[in-house]
Amino acid sequence: MPELPEVETIRRGLARHLVGRRIGYAEVFHPRAVRRHSGGAADFTGRLIGRRIQAVLRRGKYLWFALDSDLALLAHLGMSGQFLLADAASPSPKHLRARFAFTDGDPELRFVDQRTFGGLTLAPLIADVPASISHIAPDILDVAFDEAEFHRRFTQRRTGVKRALLDQTLISGVGNIYADEALWRARLHYATPTVDISAATCRRLLAALRAVFRAALRAGGTSFDALYVNVNGQSGFFDRSLAVYGRAGQPCRRCGTAIVREPFMNRSSFRCPACQPVPRRPHW
């Protein structure tokens, strides 16, 4: 699933090409693409015609097109959602779920989703955020992110540190890949109890998370397959710089110890046994 760096890479590409343009035509090709929109496909497309895109914004893994009249076209990419820019005359991709044309011509916007876990909906804007995601916490790159408040709520969770990082109501945009990478940089085991994390350790963890996000953004995100691409259809290449994720059996880039892969919440965690030893009181 795309995490913050991938969604932010897409957001930047969309903003460059779409801000200020007016939607002249919209079409939905698969009902699951708008299953979260209670009015259905006809209402969804009808309410978009004539709307101008004023901004393309993001919170965590969600992105939205802020439209005039305090309305947002809200998107979640799920496992395989893609926004692609293309000329109207170019061939349609295999898993095209929706398309949007503009009154000023090409390029048009296409929503492609192989697994159909992603989706689009319309939502009212409240304080510049779609009402339906107002419960999602700011992410670490958001100017509204408060480190002291995060630490206070973090230690109250009484869970393992990685579980807390994946809680989108506590901090948004963090998924399995970047949680593992940040924990490696901060030298923390994923089962370290949040109650044991001091303010100083929390600052170290957040600094590690910021650093890995910024490095991933410079690389255009992480692509393990063709399911994540930017708006031009290009893959990111941060996978070449990953320290632990997907590197089981390979040497730690810091100490040389073999990276291990362990089951975690129906997925996997990757860590260095030497740099990230099991804590005295692990919270699995």
UniProtKB/Swiss-Prot annotation:
* Known catalytic reactions: Hydrolysis of DNA containing ring-opened 7-methylguanine residues, releasing 2,6-diamino-4-hydroxy-5-(N-methyl)formamidopyrimidine; 2'-deoxyribonucleotide-(2'-deoxyribose 5'-phosphate)-2'-deoxyribonucleotide-DNA = a 3'-end 2'-deoxyribonucleotide-(2,3-dehydro-2,3-deoxyribose 5'-phosphate)-DNA + a 5'-end 5'-phospho-2'-deoxyribonucleoside-DNA + H(+)
* CDD domains to which the protein is assigned, alphabetical: EcFpg-like_N
Cofactor binding remark: Binds 1 zinc ion per subunit.
InterPro entries registered for this protein in UniProt: DNA_glyclase/AP_lyase_DNA-bd, Formamido-pyr_DNA_Glyclase, FPG_cat, MutM-like_N-ter, Ribosomal_uS13-like_H2TH, Znf_DNA_glyclase/AP_lyase, Znf_FPG/IleRS
Matching entries from Gene3D superfamilies are given as: 1.10.8.50, MutM-like, N-terminal
The cofactors named for this UniProt entry are:
Zn(2+)
Q: Out of the domains of life, which is the source? A: Bacteria
Q: Which Pfam families match?
A: Fapy_DNA_glyco, H2TH, zf-FPG_IleRS
**Which positions are annotated as binding DNA?**
95, 115, 157
Q: Which UniProt keywords apply?
A: DNA damage, DNA repair, DNA-binding, Glycosidase, Hydrolase, Lyase, Metal-binding, Multifunctional enzyme, Zinc, Zinc-finger
Per UniProt, what is one GO molecular function of this protein? zinc ion binding
ZnF (FPG-type) intervals: 243-277
Decide whether keyword Calcium is in the record.
no
One annotated GO biological process: base-excision repair
**Entry EC number(s):** 3.2.2.23, 4.2.99.18
| Active site, per annotation | 2-3, 61, 267
Q: What does this protein do?
A: Involved in base excision repair of DNA damaged by oxidation or by mutagenic agents. Acts as a DNA glycosylase that recognizes and removes damaged bases. Has a preference for oxidized purines, such as 7,8-dihydro-8-oxoguanine (8-oxoG). Has AP (apurinic/apyrimidinic) lyase activity and introduces nicks in the DNA strand. Cleaves the DNA backbone by beta-delta elimination to generate a single-strand break at the site of the removed base with both 3'- and 5'-phosphates.
Q: What protein family is recorded?
A: Belongs to the FPG family.
Subunit structure, briefly?
Monomer.
Protein's UniProt name: Formamidopyrimidine-DNA glycosylase
| Gene source species | Acidothermus cellulolyticus (strain ATCC 43068 / DSM 8971 / 11B)
* Source species taxonomy: Bacteria, Bacillati, Actinomycetota, Actinomycetes, Acidothermales
